[in-house]
Regions:
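Fe-S-dependent hydro-lyases/dehydratases of central metabolism
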Residues: 1-218
Length: 218
């Protein structure tokens, strides 16, 4: 077990409000570093009713009070795609987020792990979390993709091979010339679904040329 420092902490409109309350119960009034905290209106934007509108307002008010970045209605989007596009995710960084598909960031050579709202509260306050170092499963893609084969097809084939629990307590590491040839969009699809095999993360090769082509990368 190791203590891992967070380069980015993110929560959405489901995990965020719960984390805010848990953080308050901890006795923490401020986040560890506002420049490393992001809130995204992902699940309930645009608001479908008054209750969800109030929830989004609560998130915005909290973010404004903490001085953290908030991607709200009209500025938000699919949280994991958004953070990649906005340049929050860089190779080698560690991202803790209150969503199971945080493994998506492995597409850009980052370690992203999804945590529960109580753990996210601790990350917001302390900027760190405990992590058991996962073992690695090497997934080698050889040859070239055939026409109409997508990144999602590849990861579904992997999950079909190892099963929905085959990656438990592991990281999937995608290697080989087939992995290196994947586009950024394909990498995102492959890494995003690593959790569907129980994996903590799905790491793709960090190739400078393809990483530089990612929208918003800086």
């Amino acid at each position: 077990m190791i203590t891992v420092r967070c380069d980015v902490v993110m929560a959405n409109d489901v995990s965020g409000p719960i984390a805010f309350r848990a953080m308050e119960k901890m006795g923490a009034s401020r986040v560890f570093d506002p420049s490393k905290v992001v809130m995204v209106a992902d699940h309930f934007a645009p608001a479908k009713d008054a209750r969800t509108a109030e929830l989004l307002k609560h998130m915005k008010d909290w973010a404004d009070g903490q001085g953290v970045t908030f991607y709200g209605q009209g500025r938000g989007g699919i949280e994991h795609t958004l953070l990649c596009e906005e340049g929050w995710i860089v190779p080698g960084s560690v991202i803790a987020a209150g969503d199971s598909h945080t493994c998506t960031y492995g597409a850009l050579g980052a370690f992203g792990t999804g945590l529960g709202s109580t753990d996210i509260a601790a990350c917001l306050a302390l900027g760190e979390f405990w992590q058991a170092v996962p073992a690695t499963i090497r997934v080698e893609f050889t040859g070239e993709k055939q026409p109409f084969v997508t990144g999602k097809d590849l990861i579904l084939a992997v999950i079909g091979e190892i099963g929905v629990a085959g990656g438990n307590d592991h990281v999937l590491e995608f290697v080989g010339e087939g992995a290196a040839a994947l586009t950024i969009d394909e990498r995102l699809a492959v890494a995003n679904m690593a959790v569907e095999a129980g994996s903590e993360n799905g790491l793709a090769p960090c190739l400078s040329a393809s990483i530089r082509s990612a929208p918003g990368m800086r």
